[in-house]
C-alpha cells in the first residue's frame, strides 16, 4: 500500500515558524515520555498533555516494527508510521493537534541498529549492504541485531534522509537517538580479540563520528530549532558541543549519572542517607560539562508502582519521596523528562500540573540552565539533617527562586536558611501540600528576612520544612519593596513571564480542534499558592500507585 503523505492539510504554521527559538537553549523544556499504545485516542493524549502543562512529548518509536516485544526499538520500515495506531493521516493529525496545543513532538529514533529479517535490510541485495562487512563485528553484542556500516555513503544518505523525512514530512520537533554508545565504540560490549581497532589503534568508530557530525549539521541547517538528543552512557566528551568545534553537535544528552545517583540515594533508609550525601550533591560538579536532560522516565523508574518499590518507608513516605524526586528534578539545572502513569491518582496529577506551572512561570528555573550564574548553593553540607538548599537565578535579583529540600523522614519546625538579601520570601510551592496527598507542613505567611547570620550570609529566614519534602520560595529584595507602586507593579509583571513556548506558537490550548476537549485554564502569573491553613497531621494517604 502506498500513502500520499503530501495530501494532508497542516494547521500548525505558527508553531513551525517559531520552532527555531529552541536553538538558544533558554526555553523551558518539560517532556512527558510515553508510548502511543497507552492511549485510547489522539484526543485523549493531547488533552492530558495540555492540561498537565508539558511543553513536549517524547514518543517511543512510531516507525513500523514487527516484533511487539521490542517496543518498537527494532525498526523494520523507517519511512512508515506503524499501522498499530492508525493511518499515516492519523499520525499527521496527532502531530498537528499537539502543535496547535503548543506541545512539541520528540520521536525516539534508532540509527544504531536494525533487526535481522530476510524481508528487511539484512543482506538487502544478497550481500552486507547496510550492515558492517565483518560478520563477527556486524552483530549487536546485546540485542543480536545488525549494526550499520557508517562508512558506506549509501547508509549515510539513507539515515540522514530518514531523519529529515520525519522532521519535514511529519513535522517532528526532535529526535532522541537510541543506543549511541553502540555507534561510537568499536569495542562496545566486546572482549579483546572480538573487535578491530581503527587506523590509530584506538576503539573509536571514526566512520560513526563523521556520520553523526554530518547528520546533525544537515538536520540543523534544514530544520532550525529541531532538538537532537543522545542517549549515551559511555561519557563521550563534549557530546553536545558544536560541530564547528569538531564535536558531535547534539543539543542535549540524557543525564544518566544524575538519575543513577539520585535513585541510589533515595533507595537508602533516611537514617543512613547522611553517609551518601555526596550522591545528592555530586551532580553540580559536572552539570555544565554537557547540555543535559534530567530523566525520571520509564527506563529509569518504570511505573509508579515500580518507582515506589525502589523507595524505603511506609506507603505515605514512598508517595512523599516520589513527589520530592519530581520536584527536585524540576528545580535542578537541566531540561526535564518524566513518565508518571497516565492514570495516576488525582493528587499526583494536580501535583505534576502545579510543578510544571511553577517551572514555566519562573525564568530562573530554565533561562541559565547552562551557565554557572544560574545556580548557587545555600546549604551544601547539611548531611546530618539530610537537607540541601540552593538558589536558581537570572540576571535580575527579583527573579531569584530559593529551594529547600529535606530528605529526612522527620519535619523541621523552625529551620533556618541563609538568604541572599533583605526582603520578602513567599512560598510558591510545597510538595507536602494536602492537595497533593501530603500532611500540610507548609509556610502560609510571607517570610521577612531577618538580620541574623546563617550559612555565611548576613540575612536569613526561619521556616517549616516538611519531612521528605521540598519548599520553594520567590525572593523580592527590599529595594524593590520600597519602589513606587506603579514601578513595583511593572517589576512584578516581569517576574511572572509565563510559558513563552506556547505563546510563541501563536495558539492557546483552547484553540485545539473541537475533537479535543477545550482547556480554558491558562498558566497563572505565579505558581499556585498554598491554600491550606491547618498544619495538623492527617491519616495516611492512599498509595500513589493505586488506580484512580
What feature does the model see in each segment?
Residues 171-173, 188-340, 360-432, 439-440:
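Conserved alpha/beta catalytic core and glycan-binding cleft of carbohydrate-active enzymes
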Residues 40-41, 87-90, 154-159, 204-211, ...:
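Soluble or luminal CAZymes and related metallo-dependent hydrolases
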Residues 13-26, 35-40, 44-204, 463:
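Substrate-binding/active-site clefts of carbohydrate-active enzymes
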Amino acid at each position: 500500500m502506498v500513502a500520499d503523505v503530501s495530501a494532508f492539510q497542516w494547521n500548525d504554521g505558527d508553531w513551525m515558524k517559531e520552532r527555531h527559538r529552541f536553538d538558544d537553549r533558554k526555553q523551558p523544556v518539560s517532556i512527558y515520555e510515553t508510548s502511543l499504545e497507552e492511549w485510547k485516542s489522539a484526543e485523549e493524549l493531547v488533552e492530558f498533555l495540555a492540561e498537565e502543562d508539558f511543553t513536549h512529548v517524547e514518543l517511543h518509536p512510531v516507525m513500523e516494527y514487527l516484533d511487539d516485544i521490542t517496543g518498537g526499538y527494532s525498526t523494520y520500515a523507517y519511512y512508515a508510521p506503524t499501522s498499530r495506531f492508525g493511518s499515516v493521516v492519523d499520525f499527521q493529525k496527532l502531530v498537528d493537534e499537539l502543535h496547535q496545543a503548543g506541545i512539541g513532538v520528540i520521536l525516539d529514533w534508532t540509527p544504531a541498529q536494525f533487526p535481522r529479517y530476510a524481508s528487511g535490510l539484512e543482506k538487502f541485495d544478497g550481500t552486507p549492504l547496510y550492515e558492517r562487512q565483518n560478520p563477527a563485528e556486524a552483530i549487536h553484542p546485546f540485542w543480536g541485531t545488525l549494526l550499520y556500516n557508517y562508512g558506506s555513503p549509501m547508509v549515510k544518505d539513507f539515515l540522514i534522509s530518514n531523519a529529515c523525512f520525519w522532521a519535514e514530512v511529519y513535522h517532528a520537533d526532535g529526535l532522541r537517538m537510541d543506543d549511541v554508545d553502540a555507534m561510537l565504540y568499536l569495542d562496545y560490549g566486546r572482549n579483546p580479540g572480538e573487535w578491530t581497532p581503527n587506523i590509530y589503534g584506538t576503539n573509536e568508530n571514526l566512520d560513526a563520528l563523521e556520520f553523526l557530525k554530518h547528520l546533525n549539521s544537515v538536520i540543523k541547517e534544514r530544520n532550525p530549532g529541531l532538538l537532537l538528543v543522545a542517549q549515551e552512557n559511555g561519557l563521550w566528551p563534549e557530546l553536545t558541543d558544536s560541530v564547528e568545534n569538531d564535536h558531535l553537535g547534539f543539543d542535549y544528552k540524557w543525564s544518566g549519572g544524575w538519575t543513577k545517583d539520585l535513585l541510589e540515594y533515595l533507595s537508602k533508609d533516611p537514617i543512613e542517607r547522611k553517609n551518601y550525601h555526596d550522591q545528592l550533591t555530586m551532580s553540580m560538579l559536572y552539570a555544565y560539562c554537557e547540555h543535559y536532560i534530567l530523566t525520571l522516565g520509564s527506563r529509569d523508574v518504570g511505573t509508579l508502582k515500580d518507582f515506589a518499590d525502589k523507595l524505603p518507608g511506609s506507603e505515605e513516605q514512598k508517595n512523599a519521596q516520589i513527589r520530592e524526586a519530581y520536584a527536585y528534578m524540576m528545580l535542578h539545572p537541566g531540561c526535564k523528562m518524566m513518565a508518571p502513569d497516565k492514570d495516576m491518582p488525582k493528587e499526583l496529577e494536580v501535583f505534576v500540573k502545579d510543578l510544571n506551572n511553577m517551572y514555566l512561570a519562573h525564568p530562573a528555573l530554565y533561562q541559565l540552565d547552562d551557565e554557572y550564574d544560574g545556580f548557587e548553593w545555600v546549604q551544601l553540607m547539611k548531611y546530618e539533617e539530610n537537607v540541601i538548599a540552593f538558589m536558581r537565578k537570572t540576571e535580575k535579583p527579583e527573579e531569584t527562586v530559593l529551594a529547600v529540600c529535606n530528605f529526612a523522614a522527620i519535619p523541621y519546625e523552625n529551620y533556618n536558611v541563609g538568604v541572599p538579601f533583605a526582603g520578602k520570601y513567599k512560598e510558591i510551592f510545597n510538595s507536602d501540600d494536602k492537595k497533593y496527598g501530603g500532611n500540610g507542613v507548609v509556610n502560609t505567611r510571607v517570610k521577612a528576612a531577618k538580620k541574623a547570620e546563617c550559612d555565611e550570609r548576613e540575612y536569613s529566614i526561619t521556616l517549616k520544612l516538611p519531612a521528605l519534602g521540598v519548599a520553594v520560595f520567590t525572593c523580592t529584595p527590599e529595594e524593590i519593596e520600597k519602589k513606587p507602586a506603579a514601578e513595583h507593579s511593572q517589576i512584578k509583571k516581569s517576574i511572572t513571564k509565563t510559558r513563552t513556548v506556547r505563546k510563541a506558537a501563536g495558539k492557546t490550548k483552547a484553540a485545539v480542534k473541537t475533537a479535543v476537549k477545550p482547556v480554558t485554564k491558562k498558566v497563572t502569573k505565579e505558581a499556585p499558592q498554598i491554600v491550606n491553613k491547618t498544619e495538623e497531621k492527617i491519616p495516611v494517604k492512599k498509595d500513589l500507585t493505586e488506580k484512580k
